[in-house]
């Protein structure tokens, strides 16, 4: 960790970056650190406890609009960065990405393609526990599945913590804030909560990198990640595309191919 701190201090002192986004110790686990001065860089940590996806801050202009930014990235953050780059949300010359390998050595990536190459050795995989939960849900009848999710949605208070924590929810104006017309009702009720989550999952189709930030952020413990990760598996099975990699062919939901399957049309 000392090598990472030394690297960050050097970057700040030499003026290579204006801000370093990383992790520090908090009162209840780790929390984001926004480091602009070298004298607080010794608060940086990067270990297995750093599970929240701090790549969410890379699309915040109030943080990144003042100059070059560095980020100390975990694997989920690296996948997010590649996905955001694919969606033209990041500028390569405005971002410096750091990581730490298994030997504690600091990796400074030269660009998004290098991150993409690095991630090839760490393919995106759903945990065995989540796979079992998804399989259990898929074995249910449609009516049983609907009853299960309506039960979960009845807990939702529409705080939008899932949206705030997701690094790929970066719309300047979310559909739930549009009131002309009112696509989704603003109050919390099982059916309108379900409308919101179905909309969110569809927007994540082919994009979710499986970081679990939505589940972690939910104060009611709703397993929202099972929706997006199940969709992620379906996209991989049907289109052969995994998110968190530079897909030159285009986004699966905005790209048409003449040979696309049409057997779902009745």
Please describe what each predicted stretch is.
Residues 133-153, 171-266:
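Ferredoxin-type iron-sulfur electron-transfer modules in oxidoreductases and energy-metabolism complexes
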Residues 79, 164, 216:
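Short alpha-helical basic/polar micro-motif
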Residues 27-34, 109, 161, 175, ...:
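Aromatic-enriched hydrophobic runs in primary sequence
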Residues 77, 162, 223-224:
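Helix N-cap / loop-to-helix initiation motif
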Residues 154-174:
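Extended mid-to-C-terminal alpha-helical interaction segments
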Residues 1-155, 167:
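Iron-sulfur-associated redox domains of electron-transfer enzymes in respiratory
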């Amino acid at each position: 960790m000392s090598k990472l701190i030394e690297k960050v201090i050097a970057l700040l002192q030499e003026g290579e970056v204006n801000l370093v986004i990383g992790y520090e110790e908090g009162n209840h686990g780790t929390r984001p650190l926004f480091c602009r001065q070298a004298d607080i860089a010794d608060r940086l940590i990067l270990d297995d406890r750093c599970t929240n996806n701090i790549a969410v801050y890379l699309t915040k202009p109030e943080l990144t609009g003042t100059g070059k930014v560095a980020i100390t990235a975990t694997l989920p953050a690296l996948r997010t960065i590649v996905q955001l780059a694919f969606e033209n949300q990041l500028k390569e010359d405005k971002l410096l990405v750091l990581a730490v390998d298994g030997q504690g050595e600091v990796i400074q990536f030269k660009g998004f393609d290098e991150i993409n190459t690095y991630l090839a050795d760490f393919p995106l995989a759903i945990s065995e526990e989540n796979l079992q939960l998804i399989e259990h849900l898929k074995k249910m009848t449609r009516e049983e599945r609907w009853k299960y999710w309506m039960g979960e949605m009845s807990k939702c208070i529409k705080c939008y913590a899932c949206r705030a924590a997701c690094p790929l929810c970066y719309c300047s104006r979310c559909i739930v804030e549009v009131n002309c017309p009112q696509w989704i009702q603003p109050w919390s009720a099982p059916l309108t909560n379900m409308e919101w989550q179905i909309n969110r999952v569809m927007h994540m189709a082919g994009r979710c990198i499986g970081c679990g930030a939505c589940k972690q952020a939910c104060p009611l413990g709703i397993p929202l990640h099972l929706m997006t990760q199940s969709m992620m598996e379906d996209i991989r099975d049907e289109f052969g595309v995994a998110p968190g990699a530079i897909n030159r062919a285009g986004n699966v939901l905005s790209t048409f191919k003449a040979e696309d399957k049409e057997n779902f049309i009745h």
